[in-house]
Amino acid sequence: ASGEVVYDLPPVSSVAEAASFLESASGLHGHTLARMAAGYANDGSGSTMETLWYHAFCLPPRLGGMHLQRPLQNVPLEWPDEVSALVSHQTMRPDFFWALYRAACEHQGKDHASEEALAEDCNRARDYELCGIDYFPVTKKDAHSEKAVRAFLAQLVEKFAPYEGPSFKRRMRQRLDDPDVVLARSVLLSQLMPASQRWHDEDA
């Protein structure tokens, strides 16, 4: 497919609308699995890689996820008035934002490789810092293997731990390293990684 990319279009549907439909469609074949899938879905994903990372963050461990708190996805953030004259953007929409943890995550694709795009990424990082938000950019290298995904998830766990109870880090580390969860995470990546984003030797 080719053509102009159009942004900010309204979504065709929402998780709430899908769940509402399934509530009234109990006689359909596959209804139980469809309701389960709707329960795991989230509104706001803007790309296949965002969808992959969302599932790695939030699915139950038996399905390859960490079962972290659900982030907001591509929801505009308003900056505090005291920094409005300092930031480069008056609002931003991080791919993922956890308000409780004051953390944002964004996937950086190939369109972030030019000098202009790199400057924009630097401005975004500084804006997050000025507003007291920890910023975690990810690239396809961070998703090129289960081990790489696990390493990034471990960084998020370290960031989130001070906001949680004393058992949080222990539970998350168990999920990171449990052999059954590692296998499920590998299966998840094999199913969701788009061919265009797969890591090749020439990317090193």
State what each model feature region is:
Residues 8-204:
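Surface segments flanking catalytic/ligand-binding clefts of nucleic-acid enzymes
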